[in-house]
């Protein structure tokens, strides 16, 4: 696991280099930010890295990164590959990473990666409303995008959750139209988005934080940011809950010494 973490750290360093060069703002997100605050680096059992960017900056990064990334790394997006998740990743091509719900019927790169989540302004609605909405959207997306075998139940699920998904989207569009969007920010709601909002002033202006002995961009107020996500985030979970996401990790398909020959 440690070899995989160090390879992911090198991907993050490359992203940081490109972002600094082109003035693209990003920040550590999710479990990666939690690891930085609580452990000074990776959560010991964590096997991925999460960062966030505003939607505009993520689009700029998507344009620039393919020309800037070092050899052996690739930018993976829903537009470039038929991916399982509709988010952007920087993948390492000399590794193999398999999650329990990986779809081997789809042809996409499955190396170690850094997730890049796009963030947008959110309407000024209550946090409870946003969380209920996010969970409903997440469930609908999950049902609609997993493989179905033909049956009356599957047909019913597609129609029911399809209609519910469209209804939720219309409610969310109405919230954007009727409320100001100057207080909160969060990730674009996708299959793993749960509608957790952050105040803009706890994200911007960005700060820096130490992660594995190096400094990376972080939210302005990591405590408030992590409290939104995890509440009592400094409490280490019991051993039985300290689980990796992957079911199989191969940090190097070809030994690095052979690659350099």
Where are these regions (language model features)?
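Short, conserved charged micro-motifs
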Residues: 59-63
């Amino acid at each position: 696991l440690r070899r995989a973490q160090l390879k992911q750290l090198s991907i993050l360093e490359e992203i940081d280099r490109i972002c600094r060069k082109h003035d693209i703002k990003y920040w550590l997100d999710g479990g990666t930010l939690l690891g930085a605050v609580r452990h000074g680096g990776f959560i010991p059992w964590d096997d991925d890295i999460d960062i966030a960017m505003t939607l505009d900056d993520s689009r700029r990064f998507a344009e620039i990164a393919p020309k800037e990334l070092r050899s052996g790394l690739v930018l993976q997006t829903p537009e470039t590959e038929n991916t399982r998740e509709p988010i952007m990743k920087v993948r390492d091509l000399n590794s193999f990473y398999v999650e329990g719900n990986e779809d081997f019927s789809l042809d996409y790169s499955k190396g170690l990666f850094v997730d890049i989540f796009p963030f947008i302004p959110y309407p000024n609605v209550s946090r409870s409303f946003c969380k209920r909405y996010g969970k409903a959207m997440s469930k609908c997306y999950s049902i609609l995008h997993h493989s179905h075998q033909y049956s009356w139940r599957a047909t019913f699920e597609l129609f029911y959750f399809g209609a519910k998904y469209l209804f939720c989207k219309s409610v969310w569009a109405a919230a954007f139209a009727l409320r100001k969007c100057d207080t909160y920010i969060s990730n674009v709601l996708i299959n793993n988005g749960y509608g957790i909002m952050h105040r803009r002033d706890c994200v911007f202006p960005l700060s820096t934080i130490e992660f594995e002995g190096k400094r990376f961009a972080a939210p302005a107020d990591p405590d408030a940011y992590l409290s939104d996500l995890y509440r009592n985030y400094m409490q280490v979970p019991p051993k039985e809950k300290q689980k990796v996401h992957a079911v199989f990790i191969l940090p190097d398909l070809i030994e690095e010494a052979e690659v350099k020959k």
